């Protein structure tokens, strides 16, 4: 099959969190099965990132220019980065999308659009409808507007989103929670398909202690980790309040809290002020965003990972923490909660008392903690990408006509 993935953000722009990681995992998994997979995305500053490389280096790394923008080839997947004429947060305006669709869209059997609050996906969906090309929409947790520009997002749903979903052959949800949200908002239940996310562990793990050493965190300290965008939706402020309710020490162990992730709308400054007011500044560290080995080192060196979100369609970071063998605490509003519960950690209400009680229970009960460490391996074994990739392959096949003899399955620009 010839598959086009459309996403506002994609590797190497990992600062946008989970979506680039998810799209790449699915794309590479399908390419390994022999499908022609292309990714259409926005350019968030490749010129700056690649300027130190020579032309020969760029070619060796799989980079070159296409008629539409930068092009990258990696493990059988070709990605096109459309120039961005305007950028605001994770939204861009990419006029070249119209030209791309006119020239290339007819080459694909199916289109998969990730995310809903952007112009790129909407433009491709409109073009796909006009060509009777089936397309799949995956909201990636954006469907319910929780924070930031809520009324604007509701207007988008009314004027744009309804058409996007109405024209979709299938809408992907990654948890039972997201299925309920979509159905309650009027998306036809027979159109919704549940497909969980996966987790991809590193081939080799960073040396234990590397992350703590980088931040001068003592080996004997009990380390609580939050890793993700410092966004109101993810409730880092609730975690800080919960941490402030905990004792400074449990037994011989000092408790420390690390926030690892990009700032969002000055949230870090508000957290810093709150930590000072609570008298815990000396035990709260902001590491900034972490990627690659640094991210996995943080998971591995932590004692507990916390995802206290107001709403989370799945919760990839909790799955990653479990893959590193670190027990987790997640709120009931996280899609991954049913998989985590009493296997790899605790599921709690979205309030500071519940989070604080769960953390103290985990850190004071070595037997329970050891059970959850073992459970992390069990959860990870259930979260490989193989099943989600197989599910998407079957879904796409049901949406597309039989292949025409002689048509290339090679990725296209």
Regions found by a protein language model. Give the residues of each.
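Conserved donor-binding/catalytic core segment of Leloir-type glycosyltransferases
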Residues: 4, 218-234, 240-243, 258, ...
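Glycosyltransferase donor-sugar binding loop
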Residues: 45-46, 199, 227, 256-272, ...
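A short helix/loop element that forms part of the nucleotide-sugar donor recognition site in Leloir-type
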Residues: 51-68, 204-217
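Nucleotide-sugar donor phosphate/pyrophosphate-binding loop at the beta->alpha transition
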Residues: 134, 144-167
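Carbohydrate-associated surface elements
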Residues: 177, 198
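Aromatic "clamp/platform" in nucleotide-sugar-dependent glycosyltransferases that forms part
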Residues: 310
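Short hydrophobic beta-strand element within catalytic cores of glycosyltransferases
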Residues: 327-330
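Conserved acidic donor-binding segment of nucleotide-sugar-dependent glycosyltransferases
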Residues: 342, 346-353, 361-367
């Amino acid at each position: 099959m010839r598959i086009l993935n459309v996403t506002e953000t994609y590797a190497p722009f990992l600062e946008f969190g989970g979506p680039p990681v998810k799209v790449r995992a699915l794309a590479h998994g399908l390419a390994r099965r022999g499908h022609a997979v292309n990714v259409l995305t926005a350019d968030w500053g490749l010129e700056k990132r690649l300027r130190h490389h020579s032309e020969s280096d760029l070619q060796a790394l799989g980079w070159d220019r296409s008629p539409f923008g930068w092009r990258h080839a990696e493990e059988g997947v070709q990605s096109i980065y459309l120039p961005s004429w305007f950028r605001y947060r994770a939204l861009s305006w990419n006029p070249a999308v119209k030209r791309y669709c006119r020239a290339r869209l007819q080459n694909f059997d199916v289109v998969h659009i990730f995310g809903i609050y952007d112009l790129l996906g909407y433009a491709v969906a409109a073009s796909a409808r006009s060509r009777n090309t089936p397309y799949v929409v995956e909201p990636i947790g954006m469907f319910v507007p929780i924070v930031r520009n809520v009324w604007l997002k509701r207007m988008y749903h009314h004027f744009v989103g309804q058409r996007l979903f109405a024209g979709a052959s299938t809408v992907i949800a990654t948890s039972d929670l997201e299925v309920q949200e979509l159905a309650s908002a009027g998306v036809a239940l027979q159109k919704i398909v549940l497909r969980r996310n996966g987790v991809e562990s590193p081939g080799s793990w960073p040396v234990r202690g590397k992350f703590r050493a980088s931040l001068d965190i003592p080996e004997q300290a009990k380390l609580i980790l939050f890793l993700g965008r410092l966004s109101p939706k993810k409730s880092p402020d609730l975690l800080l309040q919960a941490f402030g309710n905990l004792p400074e020490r449990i037994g011989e162990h000092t408790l420390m809290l690390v926030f690892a992730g990009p700032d969002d709308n000055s949230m870090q400054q508000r957290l810093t002020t709150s930590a000072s007011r609570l008298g815990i500044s000396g035990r709260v560290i902001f590491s900034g965003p972490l990627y690659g080995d640094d991210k996995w080192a943080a998971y591995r060196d932590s004692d507990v990972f916390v995802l206290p979100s107001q709403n989370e369609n799945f919760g990839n970071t909790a799955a990653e923490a479990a893959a590193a063998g670190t027990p987790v605490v997640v709120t009931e509003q996280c899609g991954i909660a049913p998989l985590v519960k009493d296997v790899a950690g605790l599921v709690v209400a979205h309030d500071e008392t519940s989070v604080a009680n769960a953390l103290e229970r985990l850190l004071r009960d070595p037997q329970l903690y050891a059970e959850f460490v073992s459970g992390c391996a069990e959860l990870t074994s259930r979260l490989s990408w193989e099943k989600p990739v197989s599910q998407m392959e079957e879904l796409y096949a049901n949406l597309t006509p039989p292949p025409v003899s002689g048509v290339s399955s090679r990725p296209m620009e």
